[in-house]
Regions:
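Hydrophobic/aromatic-enriched cytosolic interaction surfaces used to assemble or bind macromolecules
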Residues: 1-359
């Protein structure tokens, strides 16, 4: 969406002269994935993770540019990375749709710019935006707009320039995830829940288009902290207990179920709120939203035992764990050297790298 500069916007190139690297940046880590084109399609190359110290990035804002530059410079040297596609923090992005009447419309970008302040709480001169035409008829255009504060994107551009890594594209994390886990040209509507360490992204995609995204300050670390406090053990022991028992009612330690259930129910309520809002509110013009076919889970903590079953029963809808290889053509011939559990943490990086293979 945001191509290699905070001032220029171009589509992702449909050709590729070498490997495609996706770089997923968060407060805790930088994950990278390399995808390689070969005669049978696309195959997984290198992948890995680098820790990001606390305080370097907070709520999507880079607080320590020099430290992040050091991490990226080291990654470039160790992995010989030259260019990447990079995720942008959803906490700092505004996503909305507007309808533009064709009568008198001369410049789409200018028309959007004039209406920005009706949709975001930031002056138009202090932001960067890009847009996508969703559909149109004889009289109007339906346009989706993504907006990010200029100072945020400028910091990301600067750290990559200083580390010597070229950026093909800056893209919303949720859009990258959708590219990885939703089959190409799938017309249905899905809710995607990215359950991470410190936060959870909730998105809705319809006909391959990201329609909505929101971030909740609730992640797997909170569940671990609850176990730590309830059982008076250290964090590492609590994390092991969470992974071993999860939400299994039949586990040998039933106390963990009730402890975790309180935390997970908070997440369930947030998911349900967005689920109901989508189904009870109509599109502009009075048309009903298409129904959500199922909820798809990804992110490192979506591996929690019993989570899909709990959400499915409590929300009375189908819930399943994502398949991040659904759009990688060689997976049936050769299983990627990455476990399914591990792959759920790499959904964003894989989706970013896939962007260079879009027609």
């Amino acid at each position: 969406m945001f191509k290699n500069s905070h001032k220029n916007f171009f589509p992702v190139p449909s050709f590729l002269s070498g490997p495609s690297f996706g770089l997923d940046i968060s407060e805790e880590s930088i994950k990278f994935t390399e995808l390689i084109s070969h005669k049978d399609g696309i195959m997984l190359g290198r992948y890995g993770e680098r820790d990001v110290p606390a305080g370097v990035i907070e709520s999507g804002k880079i607080k320590n540019l020099k430290k992040l530059e050091e991490i990226l410079t080291s990654l470039k040297k160790e992995e010989k990375i030259k260019s990447v596609l990079v995720s942008l923090p959803e906490e700092q992005i505004y996503l909305f749709r507007i309808k533009l009447e064709k009568d008198g419309l001369e410049n789409i970008r200018q028309s959007i710019e004039f209406s920005l302040e009706e949709h975001i709480p930031i002056p138009a001169q202090d932001v960067v935006f890009d847009y996508e035409i969703l559909n149109e008829d004889a009289k109007s255009l339906n346009v989706q707009v993504a907006v990010i504060p200029s100072n945020i994107i400028e910091d990301y551009v600067l750290v990559f320039e200083n580390s010597g890594i070229d950026v093909f594209l800056f893209e919303l994390e949720a859009q990258a995830i959708v590219r990885a886990i939703i089959r190409r040209e799938d017309p249905d509507t899905y809710m995607v829940v990215d359950f991470g360490k410190k936060r959870t992204g909730i998105s809705i995609v319809s006909n391959g288009i990201l329609m909505f995204t929101s971030t909740v300050d609730m992640g797997g670390v909170i569940l671990t902290n609850v176990i730590e406090k309830s059982f008076k053990i250290n964090f590492e022991e609590a994390e092991k207990m969470k992974q071993k028992y999860g939400l299994s009612r039949d586990s040998e330690n039933r106390e963990i179920f009730s402890v975790l259930l309180n935390g997970v129910s908070v997440l369930r309520d947030e998911i349900l709120k967005h689920f109901l809002f989508w189904h009870t509110n109509k599109e502009e013009g009075g048309k009903e939203h298409p129904p959500i076919k199922k909820i798809i889970l990804c992110g490192g903590d979506s591996n929690l035992i019993g989570l899909t079953e709990y959400l499915s029963v409590s929300m009375k809808t189908k819930v399943e764990v994502a398949n991040v290889w659904v759009n990688i053509s060689d997976v049936e011939k050769e299983i990627p050297q990455m476990s399914k559990e591990q792959s759920l943490s790499y959904a964003t990086a894989i989706g970013l790298a896939l962007g260079n293979f879009e027609k």
